[in-house]
Amino acid sequence: MIDKVYDSPAAAVADIPNGASVAIAGFGLSHRFPSSLVVALRDQGATDLTVYCNGLGSQGAETAQLLAENEQISNLVASFSSRPGPPTIAEEQIVAGKLTFEVVPQGILVERMRAGGAGIAGFYTEVGAGTAVAEGKDVRYFDGKPHILERAITTDYAILRGYRADRFGNVQFRGGSRNFNDSFAKAARVAIIEVEEILDVGELAPEDIDLPGVFIS
């Protein structure tokens, strides 16, 4: 049986190249971000990244903001980029034209990832119809209501955070980490996860497995 445990976060992200697309799970200011992997990716130095995330997280914390601060991101696809308070470095880069930004409603971002993992090319939704989100997208009417076409998302890599995992990569999530990790992992060609505890194979009960090891690299 394959042992999927890396010796260090640095080893886990060592192969991420310049120009890669990376989905980064995490919710809120810094809750359940894969902090160790984000720091390792910053130190690894890959540039021209396309990053998909709910948000970059708070500045000054070990979140995806670190990659923006290190000027490693060229394209950002997220549910939001700003928070109350002084502009973040990422926001300054967007205004200056150094960083392209696509806003995607939170639920739609997850569903586009889920569709990508399921092999579904796209779907129609009412969310965003009649707003700036709909610009340039196909519009069709269902039951008399406009729906816009949202294309599926697949990525080269996903970096995630879980609660526990066994050495085969079966993962248990806890709390808010269930929100994005599953869909992000399935949409990625390579999914890398950091956890609080590593178990031997068989120690994690089947009913506690939220993401099967087949989706983890």
Region spans (language model):
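Conserved alpha/beta enzyme-core scaffold
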Residues: 1-217
